[in-house]
Amino acid sequence: MMTQTLLIELLTEELPPKALNNLGNHFAAAVAEGLEKAQLVDGAAEFTAYASPRRLAVQVKNVKAVQADQKIVKKGPAVANAMKDGAPTKALEGFARGAGAKIEDLTIVHDGKQDVYAYEYVQTGKPLGELLEDIINAAVKKLPIPKVMRWGSSTFTFVRPVHGLVVLHGGDIVNVSVLGLQSSNQTLGHRFLSNGEITIENADSYAAQMREQGKVVASFAERKAAIQTALEGQARRLNASVAADEALLDEVTALVEWPVVLEAGFEEHFLAVPQECLILTMQQNQKYFPLLDQNGKLMNRFLLVSNLQTEDPSHIIRGNERVLRARLSDAEFFYKQDQKATLESRLPKLSSVVYHNKIGSQAERIERLQSIAAHIAKALGADAAAAERAARLAKADLVTEMVGEFPELQGTMGKYYARLDGETEEIAEAVEQHYQPRFAGDNLPNGKVATAVALADKLETLVGIWGIGLIPTGDKDPYALRRAALGILRMLMQYGLDVNELIQTAFDSFPKGLLNEKTPSETADFMQARLAVLLQNDYPQDIVAAVLAKQPRRLDDVVAKLQAVAAFKQLPEAAALAAANKRVQNLLKKADAALGEVNESLLQQDEEKALFAAAQGLQPKIAAAVAEGNFQTALSELASVKPQVDAFFDGVMVMAEDAAVKQNRLNLLNRLAEQMNAVADIALLGE
């Protein structure tokens, strides 16, 4: 059957830049899915998404003009029950009537179990024009649009007003109506660089015509790549690098249809302001790309992406420089104003900054942070006084002008102001880094003082917010407790601190009776669950479960244990030992009395004597290996007792009639279990 490319374009007013790429991809995928379900393409649809500030479009290859005819088989009652005394039963008559057929038109087919009556017919395929309108409308409804709007006198809703609809199959217009618009082959190009309507000649020529006639690079990916290439080229020319993240590049790509990268600058005296402030205002407010020199220092040059191409771009450059100058002047003013007061002198203002109405102000919180940070610093062997001082100043920049304007700079500005106040570099760095890690993959704090304050901050948040009942549920976690827990875990995996003891320290820093008394145990369980999530990114679930079943309170050796268990699992004896361990644990659950020492005089059979001797020899080897952190050695030693374990279970009845003998054998198995599970619960391997 003849196929051609299908093109659909929605011409809109300027779409939300942060959502544009997502909207374009969703629209294209939904259209493709609709075509697949309607069997207008063979197999998976091959499509290209287009998204620019004023349009969403999709191009789908090999779309049929008409569905293929389908053979339909409607199955009815079993032959055995369909006729009575040579006449059709009511069941058969009802089936024929429902199928719109006569009895004589029915056939007999086998349904896999029995012969049944059936009505077979050919359903003629519908043309693309009859199906496409519903497919497009369904795709529009599926778009992830949090807020919709109406325009003019229309009752239709969309993320922005829609003014044009192009629908072409090859070179033919497919007549459909979507959002109150009738399809055509007419669209508009760039708002300023293109003149009049553009007639799309063929679905395949869309991108080329938009580029050549409309001055529009319709592909989001192509525009983004062009911008990135131009930015990097300009930066190389200036012996610089571009300070930009993926989010800024995506947003700028969504703001332009014909990107032109230009170089501009600002007065050098602004560089006296901390570069983080300047970079943030350039990126966040102006969508500019700052430039860094070879030492990572901000230059007084920057790159901007214009949506206009002119022979003389100087007026565009001057206009952008003028706007930025005003922004940087504000930042410079805030910085100078903030220097008129020390961080210490700002602390009283934190009494009026509410952290949470149930657990007080930021000033009250600072008191807790000081005590927790000092405690952790002592445990780390760090300067407790420095940690306490850093914790005292950690939140002071929240009441500065700069952080009031740019909340993202909290901590960063605290570092600069701490330096200006004469605080040590260790304290200044800790003030900045106590928010780290802010997100998955973020850097951990440098040094023990910064780590102590960062741990204190996250522990106080986790325990305090949890303790007043604001527990994360589903996708709701307004105080980011999951993120705080992961940050704590990542830090503790570097240091040998007891996680439960730290939780208790944080809990004790709150006034007695303020928090739920179950908070320490509940948050410890929560941390254990988050640790499993973190580790399962790199290790199989059964290995993680085996290690965490021991409920490790020190996390600095967890990775070594995981690696050891992973190596043990590869041993030929591992599966049998894991099964034996599981059997041992099940038997131990049946013990009537408390388990104790093995009485050698009650060992009757050679197999249990041999196992006891093997366990006796194994115990010091495993204890020494575990003490030295050689977990792989400890686990590999288990392989040596497999023959004795197998022989024991083959020849010894553990649950003997003699109560003393039974208890002694359970004591022996308990001793074996302690050694087998010294590193991890190996019974969980393979589950």
From Swiss-Prot:
It is an enzyme of class 6 (ligase). Keywords: Aminoacyl-tRNA synthetase, ATP-binding, Cytoplasm, Ligase, Nucleotide-binding, Protein biosynthesis. Signal peptide: none annotated. Its EC number is 6.1.1.14. NCBIfam families: glyS. Belongs to the class-II aminoacyl-tRNA synthetase family. Pfam families: DALR_1, tRNA_synt_2f. The keyword Ligase applies. It comes from the Bacteria. One of its GO terms (molecular function) is glycine-tRNA ligase activity. GO terms for cellular component: cytosol. Tetramer of two alpha and two beta subunits. This is Glycine--tRNA ligase beta subunit. It catalyses: tRNA(Gly) + glycine + ATP = glycyl-tRNA(Gly) + AMP + diphosphate. InterPro entries: DALR_anticod-bd, Gly-tRNA-synth_bsu, Gly-tRNA-synth_heterodimer. HAMAP family: Gly_tRNA_synth_beta. GO terms for biological process: arginyl-tRNA aminoacylation; glycyl-tRNA aminoacylation. It comes from Neisseria meningitidis serogroup C (strain 053442). It is found in: Cytoplasm. The lineage of its organism: Bacteria, Pseudomonadati, Pseudomonadota, Betaproteobacteria, Neisseriales.
